[in-house]
């Protein structure tokens, strides 16, 4: 698969590694995002890349010495009793500055808790003659090592980067998909390059899902558990919470009831999942997040959302190789699932972008009770709501992932409901339809997948 995006990260790497003094760079993020691939794109032939494992410290030093032996002849002929000894030995042998990358750095720290203090000493004394890249998939450990104010390496990095999933347009570029196909496939694979690579190896979207996800031998069959192992101690509880949310329990009271626990017991695991990027809080548009009492918990990662909606309920069928029940579940609910991901993408597309000459702020959802002119109450939901930066306009959007929509009817109903919103006063309402296909009528207020993809670039 072609290497796409990451231009900002590569530029930051190169700037740090070529500055006058040796640099310390840290890179972290969940697995499968391409951290190692990115680093290898930056490293040159004279640089040294070392991938740590979970073996004992002395064995790790032996392995590192062997790798360094390719750069410095006979470097591995010596036994190094501790980490300071090996780093100082590299210093002694360094004549021309190069870069040493320690990938999965948290594995080294697990076996040698003193390692961050050793590196702090070398950095503070300005003894290093070479650049150091420290990379890790354990977001908790990397955060604790570099962002905790009490940690030895806090404030010592020249660059500290958290790698995020790639944006949707880059998947279209990497896999050569049409616009609607890009939306549907992103709803499953999300912005994770490794998943795109697995998809590319199969002839079709359907084949890729069955081969990698709905198979006991599939590369992604146990993916969530593998991801949780890096950062979560109680995997059973975390996976249970994700399962309930994936099944539609979105309020904390609903999740607590299914877990048979008080809501107070869920605050920490829910926050943990949000910090790791697996969950998000859906808050009413216009409400400050800190003061929000009315919120919904949703699975943030598309693949995780797909997994907990379609894989977890069908694990028994997958284990038995029963394909038909899974096919029926996909036929009945997959398009509805895509429509939920489509809504989220439409909100992202509107946030901070110019649409029809108007710049909008952060887009969100709104749901609740509207009061009509006749004082009649009605329940309503708006998929997309965004206020313009000048406070003059209010974009309200309806998202549909179905065919042959009556655009005029939808626009009229959208305008009617929007006029009843409690915060609509003194705003010009801008109704927008986000549709899978072009409407049967000529409608200038419709945005299609190609328009949304363009805004997400």
Regions from the PLM with identified roles:
Residues 1-324, 328:
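Phosphate-binding site recognition
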Residues 295-457:
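A cross-kingdom feature that marks ATP-driven nucleic-acid transaction machinery
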